[in-house]
A protein has these predicted regions:
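Conserved hydrophobic/aromatic beta-strand scaffold that supports enzyme active sites
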Residues: 128, 142-146, 153, 171-175, ...
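A short core secondary-structure module
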Residues: 157-201
Length: 387
């Protein structure tokens, strides 16, 4: 029984492990060296983007028929995890490309898919997601951005807030009210291009973490777009937005895993080298207990995240629950693990000369975006009570 090597349950296929190794190699050489600089300057890590693009890791989820690598949901999560291990800001390149394009994959016309997905797959463009507004965060259905039909066009007016990679991305999935009397059933989704007249951007937000990924407001001032840029049928936008988040919360869980893994790896190396009272800090039982808890939480989060990724790929009925659970658990674990990593480094961990304080700051956002963890618990409870 112990010698049975073909038992593959709870073991990643070789091709997924190969993807991990390939991403890790690229990130070690061409992404990690830019992580501190991206954090210090707050500038988009173009060198990291170029490296990921060259290796086809910038938008791995896009199907082969649209020019993409055709990675499944688990492989995509592994890519994001490994990039986040090196640089959280850079991990938002593949993560947000998936977030922005998922509405097209779920509900877009074949023409829209061929027109836009191929540009993202080639690396010529990035795609962002515009759901939140200044007064519509967790309550996204209360948005006020309007889209009014005018012949063969729609005219959009409004403000979107907290838009990741805004100004860098060429394309945007924008959710807007087309029927003010229908609340969530009166919201529709559109593709807006950066070059459309009337599109502009606010100043970059001054953030705690993920500083290399710009976060800006997107202003829509009489933006006139062709009617064929609606994603799905009129009034189905909010449902598409929620279905999208079911899938992409898994990618935020993967991002949290990567940040936490990077912090644990660095802390392990540090405590083995650092000596106090005549021996390595790692030899103290109290430190070993901390490391054990960090590793345990991380592996539990990884198993849940990979299970959720499998459900995303299959389109399982319980994806809503598992996507929320993975995002919530992994991000809470990442915040705890990165905080403990800072503690293990002591005063050094509190300085910018060491990466763990950056990782702690980067981890915080994973508890907030794509639905706060309080909202995730509401989502999970509702799913449990439906059964």
């Amino acid at each position: 029984m112990a010698a049975e090597q073909s038992f593959d349950v709870y073991r990643l296929p070789e091709e997924h492990e190969a993807i991990r190794e390939a991403v890790r190699e690229v990130c070690a050489a061409k992404v990690a060296p830019h992580a501190a600089e991206a954090d210090e300057t707050g500038e988009f890590p173009k060198a990291s983007y170029d490296a990921l693009r060259a290796a086809d890791f910038h938008a791995p989820h896009i199907p082969v028929e649209y020019g993409g690598a055709g990675a499944d949901a688990l492989a995509t999560a592994i890519v994001i995890e490994e990039v986040a291990r090196a640089c959280a800001s850079s991990s938002l390149i593949p993560a947000v490309n998936k977030l922005g394009t998922m509405p097209l994959l779920l509900a877009g016309s074949e023409d829209l898919k061929r027109r836009y997905l191929s540009r993202v797959a080639s690396g010529d463009a990035m795609f962002s997601y515009c759901l939140s507004e200044p007064e519509a965060g967790s309550d996204a259905a209360s948005m006020t951005t309007r889209a009014v039909r005018d012949g063969d066009h729609w005219v959009l007016n409004g403000v979107k807030r907290w838009i990741t990679n805004a100004g860098v991305s060429e394309f945007y999935t924008v959710f807007a009210v087309t029927d003010p009397t229908a609340r969530s059933r009166g919201i529709s989704a559109f593709v807006v291009e950066k070059s459309d007249a009337g599109v502009s951007f606010g100043a970059p937000e001054k953030k705690l973490g993920i500083k290399g990924s710009p976060t800006r407001e997107v202003y829509l001032d009489n933006v006139r777009i062709p009617a064929d840029r609606m994603i799905g049928a009129e009034g189905t936008g909010f449902a598409t937005a929620m279905r999208t988040l079911d899938h992409t919360r898994v990618t935020i869980a993967a991002q949290a895993l990567g940040i936490a893994q990077g912090a644990l790896d660095y802390a392990k190396g540090y405590v083995q080298e650092r000596k106090q009272f005549g021996k390595a800090v790692a030899e103290f039982q109290g430190v070993q207990f901390m490391l054990a808890d960090m590793g345990m939480k991380l592996e539990a989060a990884r198993q849940l995240t990979y299970a959720a990724a499998g459900k995303s790929e299959r389109g399982d009925a319980d994806l809503t629950y598992f996507g929320a659970a993975a995002k919530c658990f992994a991000s809470d674990a990442a915040m705890e693990i990165t905080t403990d990593a800072v503690q293990l480094l002591g005063g050094y961990g509190y300085t910018r000369d060491y990466p763990v304080e950056r990782m702690m700051r980067d981890a915080k956002i994973t508890q907030i975006y794509e639905g706060t963890n309080q909202v995730q618990r509401i989502v999970m409870a509702r799913q449990l009570l439906k059964d």
